[in-house]
Amino acid sequence: MLTRFAPSPTGYLHVGNARTALVCWMYTRSQNGKFLLRFDDTDLQRSDVKHIDSIVQDLRWICIDWDVIFKQSERFKHYNEVFLQLITKGHIYACYETKEELDIKRKLQLKHGLPPVYDRSALLLTEQEKFCYEQEGRKPHFRFKLDRNEVVKWNDEVKGEINIATSSISDPVVKREDGIYTYMLPSVIDDVDFNVTHVIRGEDHVTNTAVQIQMIQALEAKVPVFAHLPLLHFDDSKISKRKGGLDIKSIKENEIEPMALASYLIKLGTSDPIEAYVNMQSLIDSFDIKKFGSASAQFNLSEIHKLNSKVLQQMPFEMVKERLSQIGVNSPEFWYFIRNNIEKFSEVAEWWQICKSNIEPVVLDKEFIKIVLDALPQGDCNENTLSEWVKAIQQTVDIKLKDLFMQLRLALTGAKTGPELAKLLIFIGKENIIARLKKY
């Protein structure tokens, strides 16, 4: 088995494409297959090497690896060879209409209630007429000639049986006037050459699939298995590169854990509940492409933030040991305590600083703080220190328990809320507690 993911490097990787990449990768890895990463960069003016680099980084960030990687721009010579073969066999033909002329044709067809399908008038041109057009300075674009008598059928892994009548489809342009190949033909040539067995992509490619099946047949190659995923929606609009904040770069900047995003994207739109997974293997083991429904799924960034907390709560110390070391935390006990109280990993450093550094405590009542200091139990802090301390304070001053805890937390941490104070005292330590209270 070989699947492929083929992004165009014209922008940052967005969540819709990331989901497709994850599904392709998990589908093949769940069956011990191979994964191919291809960059569709035939349009050299719009493609940018910086986007290739960023897509590679983003895919690695969400734990995707690959067995083969290449750029289509490295294969132009081969595309040209196949292109000429298809012209010779009558599968591709030259057209000379301008964009304006094609637009007029479409408008006339629609005006008369006809489908806006290309009329193949270029097939009627004589060699003399073609020569005259070229003398005018017109450069041809090229179309693939569809078999319009066929209803293309395939059994889709997600959508079931699909039937597309090619009589309702225009012969697709495969090469533009400027010599640039469109998406269609190079994609088919690559799939054939690399023996791609399964093509998984969004349902917006269903019509393209019917066209490409005929192209594959023209190359006398085996048609792969196809799967078309329902699209993701955000605020009732399709996810696209133009939707701000929905690229992987922005997701990372929001401090989302890779496994939180992967867990969400793989389960979104399936019959499985969306749950937190902390490693890819467990997610692969639960994967089944048949569980995807046919309806579009609503993408909700706030749900990913909730899932992020759950992923952090399940991470063992060994998984985050190196990251913790980078912020000066080497205590497994602190990690297992604090992981249940954070939404983002950066909060670990914040609470470590609160415990170990000089902070500015908030004091509402200086006299009360003197009483608190005098009532502090002897010995090192343990899980019983807080309860003993509170009892001693209440024996000295009449104060509501809620107010007592709030003032104590403010004086020791500078914050109104936070992790369980009884355990937090252990990590702050007796010396720091006394130093903070003595400031007042």
Curated annotation (Swiss-Prot):
The keyword Ligase applies. Signal peptide: none annotated. It is found in: Cytoplasm. It catalyses: tRNA(Glu) + L-glutamate + ATP = L-glutamyl-tRNA(Glu) + AMP + diphosphate. ATP binds at K241. GO terms for molecular function: ATP binding; glutamate-tRNA ligase activity; tRNA binding. PROSITE patterns: AA_TRNA_LIGASE_I. Pfam families: Anticodon_2, tRNA-synt_1c. The keyword GTP-binding does not apply. It comes from the Bacteria. A motif ('HIGH' region) lies at residues 7-17. GO terms for biological process: glutamyl-tRNA aminoacylation. InterPro entries: aa-tRNA-synth_I_cd-bd, aa-tRNA-synth_I_codon-bd_sub2, aa-tRNA-synth_I_CS, aa_tRNA-synth_I_cd-bd_sf, Glu-tRNA-ligase_bac/mito, Glu/Gln-tRNA-synth, Glu/Gln-tRNA-synth_Ib_cat-dom, GluQ/Sye. Keywords: Aminoacyl-tRNA synthetase, ATP-binding, Cytoplasm, Ligase, Nucleotide-binding, Protein biosynthesis. GO terms for cellular component: cytoplasm. Its EC number is 6.1.1.17. A motif ('KMSKS' region) lies at residues 238-242. Monomer. Belongs to the class-I aminoacyl-tRNA synthetase family. Glutamate--tRNA ligase type 1 subfamily. Catalyzes the attachment of glutamate to tRNA(Glu) in a two-step reaction: glutamate is first activated by ATP to form Glu-AMP and then transferred to the acceptor end of tRNA(Glu). NCBIfam families: gltX_bact (TIGR00464). This is Glutamate--tRNA ligase 1. It comes from Wolbachia sp. subsp. Brugia malayi (strain TRS).
